[in-house]
Structure formats: C-alpha cells, structure tokens
Amino acid sequence: MSKFPTVSEILSGKVAVGEEVAVRGWVRTRRDSKAGLSFLAVYDGSCFDPIQSIINNDLANYNDEVLRLTAGCSVIVTGKVVESPAEGQAVELHATHVEVVGWVEDPDTYPMAAKRHSIEYLREVAHLRPRTNLIGAVARVRHCLAQAIHRFFNEQGFYWVATPLITASDTEGAGEMFRVSTLDLENLPRTEEGKVDFSQDFFGKESFLTVSGQLNGETYACALSKVYTFGPTFRAENSNTTRHLAEFWMVEPEFAFATLADNAKLAEDMLKYVFKAVLEERKDDMQFFAKHIDKDVITRLENFIAAPFAQVDYTDAIEILLKSGKEFEFPVSWGIDLSSEHERFLAEEYFKSPVVVKNYPKDIKAFYMRLNDDGKTVAAMDVLAPGIGEIIGGSQREERLDVLDTRMVEMGLNPEDYWWYRDLRKYGTVPHSGFGLGFERLIVYVTGLQNIREVIPFPRAPRNANF
C-alpha cells in the first residue's frame, strides 16, 4: 500500500490497523475539545465520507497552525490508522504530524464555508461547488456511470468511435444549431445576392457544432458492425428549463443487421447494467441521495432492474391515454408527440414499469427512421422510465435509398447535402439500428435531482456560459 493511500482505501479496510500513513486532502470541519484535542475531518474526494483525524495539543504547530485551520484548508496529515471508538466509521487517524499546504485566505468570506448552501447559490460558484457533499457525490456517480457504459459496450463487442464536433450536417433536421465561424462579424463577406458568403469562411461552407454523432456513427457501423459514440453535443434551443442544456453528452450506439426489437433489447440491457453498477460501486453516494435528495432513488433503480420492459405501439398508447379518463394539460390525439405528462402516465400509472413505445407517426420523427409498411409510421422507439418519462430515443434506420430520398424531400432537406450518408445505401446497404441516451438526463434519474444543471460540471444554457 502506498504511503499516501486515499481516504476511500483507508475507510474500506484496505489499509491495516496500526499502519503509518499520510493523508492528503482538505479540511471539512475542525472541532476542539477541552481535553486538548482537535478533531479534523479530512476529505480527498475519493469517497463520500471524510476521515477523522485526532490531533493532540503536543504537536509543535498545534497552537500556531492547527487551531487556525478552517474548512477548505489543504493539509497532509501523517499518523497511525487505529480502530475508532466513535460511531460512523471503523477507523480514524491518530496524527503525529500536520502539514498545512494551503490556507483559506479569509474564512469569513470563503464561499464554501461549512454551512448549508442553496443549490441556486452553488451554481453561481460552480468552480468551487465540487467541494460540497452534493456535487462531489454527483461527480463520482457521473464517473461511475460513464465507466459502466464503456464497460457494457466493450463487453457486448462494440467499438467506441470519435465522431466530429464540427459538422455541416443537421442530424435532426431541426435547425437549432450553433454556427462555427471565423468571419469578421463587423465586415462580413457577401455574395452577389447579398447573403453571407460562407465560401470565405474557415471551412469554406456553413459549419455548426454537432447535435448528434449518429450519422457519422452509422458510417462505422456499416464497416465494424457494432459501434458507439459518447461525447458532447450542442443544441441552440432557447429553453431555460430544468430539463434542457445547450451543451450535453450523448451515448449513441449503432449496430448493423439489427431490427427495432434488437434495439429495444440493447437499450434495456444497457440501462440495467449501468444501474446495477452504480448501486454496487457507489453505495455511499447513493445513500446520501436517498437521505437528502429523493428517498425513493435506490428502490426506484432496484425496481427498474427487476422489471421486464413493457412494449406498446404508439397507436395503442394513444388509445390507452384517451381511455384513461385523465384530463391532460396537452390534449391527446393520434399524431401528437407525447409530452412528459403522457409518458409518465404510461410508465408510472398504466404499466408501472419501464415501457418501450414504438412505431410513431412519420410526420413527427426524423428523416432517417425506417418507414413501416403502413406508410404512416416509422420504426422509432422511446424508452419511458417511471419518475422521468423519456430516457432513450432510437429507431431502425432507413436502409433503402429511394425511401430515404423521398423522406428527405418530404422534410425539406436536400439529399445532395447528405451525399456521403446516401452512399451507405448504395454500397452494401444493410438494416441497422441505434439510439441516443442523454447522459445528463440519466444522471438526473439516478441521483433524484430535479435540475439537470446540477449534474454537469459547468452548465451551458441560454445567457449562461460562465467559467
């Protein structure tokens, strides 16, 4: 064992009682007793709990330094690991030396002083908020989920591919994209028609931040069979809500020779795998969320893992909603895009389990989704989860070139702009499927937090790009 074990390694019993170690971290709290002892709670971010360090007043720097320590000071505490008589943790550290590495300049104005802060306030000091119990726990859970996703796809034989963040294609055909340009805004070049001349821009054409890695991912799926992307995506959607971010991460698998049924099975297997991982690997953080954020968060994940997914056609789901007798805020009729209240009714009240809604009307779905034989619906699916609604959206992709071209024209897109995507249908086309999972929405579901801005380190939203 290293001379500098983590707090996690010490508290989990990987360091033997009686061993001399040095703990490097930050002071959470300091408490002094009349018996001439100080109790320092030192954390290093490796786990939820700090380690208690007992410091005797015979240390050389006890009066000059130890008694001045406040929340946030960085220290190296050397001492012996001993069994703790106190409740809460099995071991503690009996200090023989305390080195102060960094002081908090003015404890009275330190934004992370040892008191409870509102979540709204923490957003204003996002550069310091990972020091709190809440955001520290979110960060560890986020890491655990990301690692579990990579592990799952690797075990399933998928290859990770890096798709570009700068693109000339709009995957969703929605037009809500951030433009990338180096043109001088005060002296824009113009065409003869008076439009901005993007041929003089850095890439020689209009370019944007990507809204999805899907189209690029499909090119590799049609060569490597099974691939996935996992990276940042961007939407210039002017939505200042608890569910939207302008910059967020997406998990997007694509696999060849796969039907919509295969797609639904992959989504179910992946979600259950990562939920199981976080419950096993981050028990301390999940217990914190269950105690302070949402008391049902652990049982919700356990129930999700245990429940087989229900499946229902969109048309049947509309019938269920119409016959429910409930008065929804958004009226129900065939052809609407299901709103959050519809999704949650289906998952929470009707099926009481995760549910895959499939075969949506073509007019409310993207051009690349496979047209069904009825000519009215496409082989699309949404996975709805109790407690949040839609958590995954996907489809079988349209592999027939003539049908794809027709769909593009119907959606007002120029097939020539997607010449490279169309090539996949010209040269050895194959049925293939995939889905998208908003990573931050997954973390919101796992932690029970109400606002997506708490689960990404530096949230980007309308009129908010600080730090």
From Swiss-Prot:
EC numbers, comma separated: 6.1.1.22
Chief location: cytoplasm
Keyword Signal: no
Reaction(s) catalysed by this chain's protein: tRNA(Asn) + L-asparagine + ATP = L-asparaginyl-tRNA(Asn) + AMP + diphosphate + H(+)
BP GO terms, sorted: asparaginyl-tRNA aminoacylation
Top-rank taxon: Bacteria
Any one cellular-component term (Gene Ontology): cytoplasm
Family annotation (PROSITE patterns): AA_TRNA_LIGASE_II
Subcellular localization, as worded in the UniProt entry: Cytoplasm
One Gene Ontology molecular-function label: ATP binding
UniProt entry keywords in alphabetical sequence: Aminoacyl-tRNA synthetase, ATP-binding, Cytoplasm, Ligase, Nucleotide-binding, Protein biosynthesis
The keyword Protease is assigned to this record: no
Known partners and oligomeric status: Homodimer.
Protein family: Belongs to the class-II aminoacyl-tRNA synthetase family.
Protein known as: Asparagine--tRNA ligase
Species: Actinobacillus pleuropneumoniae serotype 5b (strain L20)
